[in-house]
């Protein structure tokens, strides 16, 4: 299974009313240059998304608000990762299937991506994913 859990840098303000700040810097804190960033928001609890694998791009997923469960699958083994703290980051490398489940209403999931958008670089069919893995051992 090709992934890394990382801690995003976090600074808490001495005044609790001002909250905290979590951040990362591309190529310093993550192993790729960021070419795209998107956020998924206003999703209801038990929303399921993802259902895909990327052939060439790596991604950093983090949940600045709420709770999202990520199911990772390398074709042989499955593992669940919980993103429920703003300083928790999950780097997913190419050829890893992912499924996302919102565990709380209005959770926000942000994704930093190593490549520009290219729909032909991912598969949304699990059987095609398994076949691609078999052909590219």
PLM region descriptions:
Residues 1-88, 105, 112, 118-127, ...:
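Non-catalytic, conserved peripheral segments adjacent to functional cores
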């Amino acid at each position: 299974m090709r992934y890394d859990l990382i801690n995003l840098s976090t600074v808490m303000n001495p005044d609790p009313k001002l909250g905290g700040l979590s951040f990362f810097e591309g190529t310093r804190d993550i192993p790729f240059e960021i070419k795209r960033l998107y956020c998924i928001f206003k999703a209801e609890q038990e929303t399921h998304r993802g259902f895909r694998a990327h052939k060439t791009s790596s991604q950093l997923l983090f949940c600045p608000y709420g709770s999202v469960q990520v199911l990772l699958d390398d074709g042989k083994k499955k593992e669940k990762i919980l993103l429920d703290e703003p300083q928790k980051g999950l780097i997913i490398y190419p050829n890893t299937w992912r499924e996302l489940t919102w565990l709380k209403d209005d959770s926000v999931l942000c994704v930093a991506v190593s490549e520009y958008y290219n729909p032909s670089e991912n598969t949304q069919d699990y059987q095609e994913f398994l076949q691609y893995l078999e052909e590219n051992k």
